Amino acid sequence: MRMPLSVLTAAGLSLATLGLGTAGPASATPTAEGAPVVAYDGSPSAGSPADAKAEAAANRAFFEAVLRSVAEKRAANPKSTAAVTVVYNASGAPSFATQIARGTQIWNSSVSNVRLQAGSSGVDFTYREGNDPRGSYASTDGHGRGYIFLDYRQNQTYDSTRVTAHETGHVLGLPDHYSGPCSELMSGGGPGPSCTNAYPNSAERSRVNQLWANGFAAAMDKALEKSAR
């Protein structure tokens, strides 16, 4: 589904005109090939039972890593009445600062049980950028920490704000649904490059609010048990 770079060049588009770099920061190394990821437009074998199972497991692992990180911080101050806040660090993806900020604004205006906030301490997940044949994806670093990788070329082919908001949806617990319509944010690259919708639909908003009301409560219980030991 990716558009060849030569076609983009012929159309007068380039990494520079799109505000994207040509190489990621040295620290923004993609996850190793074969590591489980939740990709924007699916893996080469998308649609197979094995692939669907692997993606579901990767999405669950990513969400649980973020949830656990947030819950352990909250356990230190369990009586707080403040909204649940998920802290991210976007310093590893400077080329996408605008898209990340926009994606954060979209999600914060769409759901009420959780908030996304930029920060450099108490970070729950990070953004990275670079080139990877798998495109953009959400994954874990092997140490229980989640991150979102934003691929340069894919963000030329597809609407970059939609890609970023979609991947951020995995942070909040939503799985991919490539067969969905453009109005469904988590359909990712399924509807094709012409789809520019970067907003979750009502079902997606409701699911996130439910996950962070119910799922977070369970994660908090585990975090409190751990802190009491």
From Swiss-Prot:
Spell out where the chain crosses the membrane. Answer: none
Name the UniProt key words of this record, in alphabetical order.
Calcium, Disulfide bond, Hydrolase, Metal-binding, Metalloprotease, Protease, Secreted, Signal, Zinc, Zymogen
GO biological process, alphabetically ordered: proteolysis
Residue positions binding Zn(2+) = 166, 170, 176
| Catalytic reaction annotation | Hydrolyzes proteins with a preference for Tyr or Phe in the P1' position. Has no action on amino-acid p-nitroanilides
Q: How does activity depend on temperature?
A: Optimum temperature is 55 degrees Celsius.
Classification via Gene3D superfamilies = Collagenase (Catalytic Domain)
UniProt: Ca(2+) binding residues: 159, 161
Q: Name one GO molecular function term.
A: metalloendopeptidase activity
List the active site.
Answer: 167
This protein is called Extracellular small neutral protease
Q: Which organism is it from?
A: Streptomyces sp. (strain C5)
